[in-house]
């Protein structure tokens, strides 16, 4: 998780633990045999993936790294936990696996970040990364449009570019470093009815909405949230029971460096 001005809310984030965990398990299933070394959960958040990593790598030291003190306080299942800016983090020893689930999308300059992380690995080690690539979807484009329209003094997206690149753009970054596997998946998420909120807003409010809400006063945030709820009613119509279906695209990469 990124460490922004306002810390993360572990309780709000955990509401959709199952939906957020499935992509991590899909990524972990593609991790090959590993050399000797630690396993690092980079951007570990509340520790949702710790148990799965422990089962997969039972004989290794498991380290959780995150920039959020609140998330680290509730994260369990690690042999060690480190509070650190994941963009500048340095391991104590070269790890066998750096596993990063839904964290690196908060950082830019992936053409430099990913080679740096790969360079920290033990020979034959693996970098496994999953990131949302949802920026063009209505759930995210509506946030930008509403923020720029309602608060132009604070939000300007005229030169904005998403941090996560198209999948093919990662190939020339990663291929010189070792064996690469790249793929995308779209998950059709069923979001249960939410009292007083559109289900998609309830899903995004602890993640994609945070950078916007952090810059707003309480009355502004209330108005922004109401406008966002209204926009979502048109793009993600509710089912008869009040639930909503939300397609969600995610990008996966597994790099095993040459030994």
Tell me the role of every PLM-derived stretch.
Residues 1-34, 48-52, 71, 208:
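Conserved class I S-adenosyl-L-methionine
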Residues 8, 181-240:
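C-terminal helical/coil "lid" or tail adjacent to the Rossmann-like core of SAM-dependent
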Residues 38-91, 112:
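Class I SAM-dependent methyltransferase SAM/SAH-binding core
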Residues 99:
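A conserved beta-strand element that flanks and buttresses the S-adenosyl-L-methionine
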Residues 102-103:
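Short catalytic micro-motifs in class I SAM-dependent methyltransferases
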Residues 107-108, 121-123:
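Helix-to-beta-strand junctions that scaffold the AdoMet/dcAdoMet cofactor pocket
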Residues 107-116:
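A short, conserved alpha-helix within the catalytic core of class I
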Residues 111, 126-194:
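Conserved catalytic/acceptor-binding region of the Class I
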């Amino acid at each position: 998780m990124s460490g922004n001005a306002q810390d993360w809310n572990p309780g709000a984030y955990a509401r959709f633990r199952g939906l957020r965990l499935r992509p991590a398990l899909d990524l972990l299933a593609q991790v090959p045999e590993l050399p000797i070394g630690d396993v690092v959960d980079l951007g570990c958040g509340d520790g949702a993936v710790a148990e799965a990593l422990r089962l997969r790598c039972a004989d290794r030291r498991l380290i959780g790294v995150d920039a959020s003190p609140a998330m680290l306080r509730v994260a369990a299942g690690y042999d060690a936990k480190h509070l650190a800016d994941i963009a500048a983090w340095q391991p104590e020893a070269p790890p066998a696996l750096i596993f990063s689930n839904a964290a690196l999308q908060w950082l830019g300059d992936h053409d430099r970040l990913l080679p740096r992380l790969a360079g920290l690995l033990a020979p034959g080690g693996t970098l496994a990364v999953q990131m949302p690539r949802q920026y063009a979807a209505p759930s995210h484009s509506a946030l930008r449009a509403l923020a720029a329209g309602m608060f132009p003094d604070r939000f300007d997206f005229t030169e904005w570019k998403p941090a996560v690149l198209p999948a093919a753009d990662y190939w020339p970054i990663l291929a010189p470093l070792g064996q690469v596997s790249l793929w995308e998946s779209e998950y059709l998420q069923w979001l249960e009815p939410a009292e007083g909120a559109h289900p998609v807003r309830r899903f995004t409010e602890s993640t994609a909405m945070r950078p916007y809400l952090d810059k707003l006063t309480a009355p502004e945030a209330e108005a922004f949230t109401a406008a966002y709820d209204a926009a979502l009613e048109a793009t993600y119509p509710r089912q008869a029971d009040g639930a909503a279906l939300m397609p969600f695209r995610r990008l996966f990469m597994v790099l095993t460096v040459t030994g």
